[in-house]
UniProtKB/Swiss-Prot annotation:
PROSITE patterns: G_PROTEIN_RECEP_F1_1 (PS00237), G_PROTEIN_RECEP_F1_2 (PS50262)
InterPro entries: GPCR_Rhodpsn, GPCR_Rhodpsn_7TM, Olfact_rcpt
Function: Odorant receptor.
Single Gene Ontology MF annotation: G protein-coupled receptor activity
Entry's Gene Ontology BP terms: G protein-coupled receptor signaling pathway; sensory perception of smell
Glycosylated sites: N5
Species name: Mus musculus
Family affiliation: Belongs to the G-protein coupled receptor 1 family.
Protein name in UniProt: Olfactory receptor 8B8
Signal peptide: none
Length: 310
């Protein structure tokens, strides 16, 4: 992903805390979070793959959301866990740039897959008669391609400018992962261009999906209020409320971290904020989308009954 930097061949990740008494409790806490994330997302991927009645556009995007959450949790959490049990959590320069690239690829992809899911719900609720035509397999694949293209473009933009920087001899990165802002703090050269890229690219990666989602849900809310059936209105609200919770957690914590002036957000507070979109959201997404979802519950019962009779 990147050649070694002549000034700094490696970094030391500070981790989440420097208090020895908190390290082991935090290790087991985040190990538990990671296991729940893995089981939840792999379970949802398996359920969607094995049950044909879930092979719809909504679950096509949910399948990819779970895949993204699984992947970027795997990019971040294992290295974070190492920081709790080792004196120095060392990561090579190339390893750091690789982690940065894949973290950004998956996190940007998630922001756009959430907007694709909002559009899917808009079509399903506001134009149900045109749903199968509008959300055809070809359209779904094009939307998914757009999601991953935006993820690649965002990750490449940040990483390409990051590898051009010269880093200071102080190798300590005040974070539990290689993220943009803590790495910029370690640069001995001007970071003006990088900060401009952060402002533009993050603005697009948060702004465009957020506007898309808000417009979609404003139209959905307007349509729901016109539904005469109480049961139909309740079902529509139930379907959308879970998505709104996930979106609020993800974009709220991301915007708080990246779009606030660094002078107003000390890095230690930034680490806590980043826990929401790196650890908490990937863990909660399978629960949010499945606990109140009748289709997923039916699929789980069918899968368990098949396995018990096999």
């Amino acid at each position: 992903m990147a050649t070694e930097n002549a000034s700094v061949p490696e970094f030391i990740l500070a981790g989440l805390t420097d208090q020895p008494g908190l390290r082991m409790p935090l290790f087991f806490l985040f190990l538990g979070f990671y296991m729940v994330t893995m089981v939840g997302n792999l379970g949802l991927i398996t359920l969607i793959g094995l049950n044909s009645h879930l092979h719809t556009p909504m679950y096509f995007f949910l399948f990819n959301l779970s895949l993204i959450d699984f992947c970027y949790s795997t990019v971040i959490t294992p290295k974070m866990l190492v920081s709790f049990v080792s004196k120095k959590n060392i990561i090579s320069y190339s390893g750091c740039m690789t982690q940065l690239f894949f973290f950004l690829f998956f996190v940007v992809s998630e922001s756009f897959i959430l907007s694709a899911m909002a559009y899917d719900r808009y079509v399903a609720i506001c134009n149900p008669l045109m749903y199968t035509v509008t959300m055809s397999p070809q359209v779904c694949l094009l939307l998914l391609l757009g999601v991953y293209v935006m993820g690649f473009a965002g990750a490449m933009a940040h990483t390409a400018f990051m590898v051009k920087l010269t880093f200071c001899a102080d190798k300590l990165v005040n974070h539990y992962m290689c993220d943009i802002l803590p790495l910029l703090e370690r640069s001995c050269t001007s970071t003006y261009v990088n900060e401009l890229v952060v402002f533009i690219v993050v603005g697009i990666d948060i702004g465009v999906p957020t506007v898309t989602i808000f417009i979609s849900y404003a139209l959905i809310l307007s349509s729901i209020l016109r539904i005469s059936s109480t049961e139909g209105r309740s079902k529509a609200f139930s379907t959308c409320s879970s998505h709104i919770i996930a979106v609020s957690l993800f974009f709220g914590s991301g915007a708080f971290m990246y779009l606030k002036p660094s002078s107003l957000l000390p890095m230690n507070q930034g680490k806590v904020s980043s826990l929401f979109y790196t650890i908490v959201v990937p863990m909660l997404n399978p629960l949010i989308y499945s606990l109140r979802n009748k289709d997923v519950k039916v699929a789980l019962r069918k899968t368990l009954s098949r396995s018990s009779f096999s």
